[in-house]
């Protein structure tokens, strides 16, 4: 566990990245190397764990170590490639904390950060897929993320180049969240968009049921007696 003094120092150094003072540049570079060393150690630990569930549990215990560094980067908002931030964002998504990962995802997309070499896909694609898969998994367990949060991710990634199948899954998750909160028209729109992007996204029957409900609700009450 890091000491309060070290956490404070890491937060200040990260926030000062890109400052004109060469001394701060060197201090920040040294601190970044320490973060990378810590990350490499944690990755070695994770590599020795076979269970996906246990890996996720391990990531939850590791993530707080990086909080001061990440807080400093987000506060400075200066951009620049940072493999620590990108990895921590992906680990946070892995743990299912979509809300906790959003500010990091926003930073990564706005500043055009790349994924480390060990990842074969772009940051935008990885974010979209993690959010969609996690959202759908939580929805099927009856504890899905909020419609507003998923819409925020969808908007963040709107102009990014992402595989159609991945974006389709994200629209599927957003549609289900909309439906869960009573926004049927919006849900239908997202379902239709998901099918436009990938017709095997697995939402056809849900859309058919929803469209029947909407049609029924839009019809005048047949039992009504007029005025």
Describe every region a protein language model picked out.
Residues 87-88, 92, 131, 167, ...:
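Structural register within alpha-helical repeat arrays
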Residues 1-82, 106-161, 216, 220-227:
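N-terminal alpha-helical interaction modules that lie
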Residues 91-92, 135, 171, 178, ...:
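Residue at a conserved register position within TPR or TPR-like alpha-solenoid repeats
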């Amino acid at each position: 566990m890091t000491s309060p003094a070290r956490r404070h120092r890491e937060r200040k150094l990260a926030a000062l990245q890109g400052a004109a003072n060469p001394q701060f540049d060197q201090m920040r570079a040294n601190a970044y190397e320490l973060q990378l060393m810590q990350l490499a150690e944690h990755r070695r630990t994770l590599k020795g764990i076979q269970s996906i569930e246990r890996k996720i549990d391990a990531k939850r215990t590791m993530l707080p170590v990086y909080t001061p560094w990440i807080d400093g980067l987000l506060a400075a908002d200066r951009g620049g490639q940072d493999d620590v931030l990108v990895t921590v964002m992906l680990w946070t998504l892995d743990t299912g904390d979509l809300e906790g990962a959003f500010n990091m995802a926003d930073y990564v997309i706005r500043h055009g950060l790349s994924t480390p070499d060990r990842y074969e896909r772009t940051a935008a694609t990885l974010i979209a897929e993690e959010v969609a898969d996690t959202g759908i998994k939580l929805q099927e367990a009856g504890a899905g993320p909020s419609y507003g949060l998923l819409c925020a991710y969808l908007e963040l990634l709107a102009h990014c180049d992402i595989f159609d199948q991945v974006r389709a899954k994200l629209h599927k998750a957003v549609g289900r969240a909309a439906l869960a909160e009573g926004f049927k028209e919006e849900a239908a729109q997202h379902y239709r968009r998901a099918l436009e992007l990938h017709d095997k996204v697995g939402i056809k029957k849900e859309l058919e049921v929803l469209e029947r409900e909407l049609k029924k609700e839009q019809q005048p009450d047949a039992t009504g007696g007029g005025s």
